[in-house]
């Protein structure tokens, strides 16, 4: 403990809104703190939707102050200089800086900080639509993503990264941390009020209302199912109005329940009969692993990365295969125990944190 007590680690994220990458940063930061490091969370947007631990040190460097500069490279160049200056003055020299998500990657491309690694949370070919971009823009991304080592949150994400950018930089796969003990404590909180139809059980999906998550596939598959249990959707996002319209069009108003975003979704998850993930693509599928931490049976679409590294083949269906997903939903409602999967302790935060430090050459003994 004393060996690393004065050593500093920085995790960079755009905001602390209620998403998986943001939760990842807080969980990993807490693990580094438990190992004796001084942990700094640097964000560019003031939004906070997660509960913040007092063990971590939080910094806000507002990106909005630079929006009056020309969009793109110039804006990111000058903002990167401001970030460098802030870190040097207010934090000092970290032993590692882990930079999450695309905007932050673009900013740090112009940074002069040392000991930086990108964390790649999604298949960039899908997230950035690389196949549709002109050569000049592709070249720009090539320069960004070959500047620093890259830590990918699943094997599928690493394969996609290497396929897109080659191997001029060091890469590895390290799964996301899942704080099983804390999740189980949080799951003991009072379950939010749900309609009476959920008393005999319900299926649940937790995720942002955006195209990646495939709500249209889930709703159609559920509409085609026996509907013996209601479906609870936890989340918010820019597709909420469209999802609500789909629910009406499929005549599911009495069967599908929208709870909105939940800062603590774990009581809802714990009491569910089963969890369903319907994504077109994922990085790691954090909530899938969280459902296993609570002993909740789970099924998922077999998106190119993430789910197949968490669930066995019998729990998976092809992406956008509505009949196959309907069949799995029916089985999940009638025989949920068929889809029980043990939690993988490789996901525990201290195990993950040690891998991060080893990758960066930081002594964590």
Q: What are these model-predicted stretches?
A:
Residues 6, 11-19, 23-27, 31-73, ...:
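N-terminal strand-loop element at the rim of the active site
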Residues 20, 334-365:
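A charged, aromatic-enriched C-terminal amphipathic alpha-helix characteristic of glycosyltransferases
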Residues 22-27, 201-224, 238-244:
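A conserved mid-protein helix/loop that constitutes part of the nucleotide-sugar donor-binding site
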Residues 85, 132-152:
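Membrane-proximal helix-turn-helix segments that form the acceptor-binding/catalytic region
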Residues 98-105, 120:
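Short His-centered aromatic/hydrophobic patch
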Residues 107-108, 147-173, 178-182:
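A short, active-site helix/loop in glycosyltransferases that binds the activated sugar's phosphate group
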Residues 261, 280:
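Aromatic "clamp/platform" in nucleotide-sugar-dependent glycosyltransferases that forms part
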Residues 312-323, 330-336:
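Conserved acidic donor-binding segment of nucleotide-sugar-dependent glycosyltransferases
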């Amino acid at each position: 403990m004393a060996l690393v007590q004065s050593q500093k680690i920085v995790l960079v994220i755009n905001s602390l809104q209620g998403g998986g990458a943001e939760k990842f940063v807080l969980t990993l930061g807490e693990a580094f703190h438990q190992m004796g490091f001084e942990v700094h969370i640097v964000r560019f947007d003031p939004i906070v939707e997660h509960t913040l631990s007092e063990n971590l040190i939080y910094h806000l460097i507002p990106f909005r102050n630079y929006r009056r500069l020309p969009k793109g490279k110039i804006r990111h160049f000058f903002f990167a200089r401001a970030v460098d200056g802030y870190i040097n003055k207010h934090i000092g020299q970290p032993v590692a800086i882990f930079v999450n998500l695309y905007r932050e990657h673009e900013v740090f491309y112009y940074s002069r900080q040392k000991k930086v690694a990108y964390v790649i949370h999604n298949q960039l070919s899908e997230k950035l639509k690389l196949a549709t971009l002109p050569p000049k823009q592709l070249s720009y991304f090539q320069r960004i993503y070959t500047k620093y080592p890259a830590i990918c949150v699943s094997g599928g994400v690493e394969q996609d990264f290497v396929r897109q950018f080659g191997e001029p930089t060091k890469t590895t796969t390290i799964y996301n941390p899942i704080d099983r003990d804390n999740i189980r404590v949080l799951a003991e909180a009072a379950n939010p009020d749900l309609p009476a139809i959920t008393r005999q059980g319900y299926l649940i999906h937790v995720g942002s209302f955006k195209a990646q998550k495939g709500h249209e596939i889930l709703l159609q598959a559920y509409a085609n199912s026996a509907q013996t249990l209601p479906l609870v959707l936890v989340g918010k996002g820019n597709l909420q109005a469209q999802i609500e319209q789909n629910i009406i069009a499929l005549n599911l108003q009495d069967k599908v329940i929208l709870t909105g975003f939940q800062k603590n979704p774990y009581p809802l998850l714990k009491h569910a009969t089963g969890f369903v993930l319907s994504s077109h693509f994922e990085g790691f599928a954090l909530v899938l692993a969280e459902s296993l931490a609570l002993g909740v049976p789970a099924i998922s679409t077999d998106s190119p990365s993430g789910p197949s590294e968490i669930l066995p083949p019998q729990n998976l269906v092809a992406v956008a295969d509505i009949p196959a997903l309907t069949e799995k939903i029916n089985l999940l409602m009638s025989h949920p125990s068929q889809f029980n999967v043990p939690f993988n302790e490789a996901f525990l935060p201290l195990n993950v944190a040690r891998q991060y430090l080893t990758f960066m050459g930081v002594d964590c003994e």
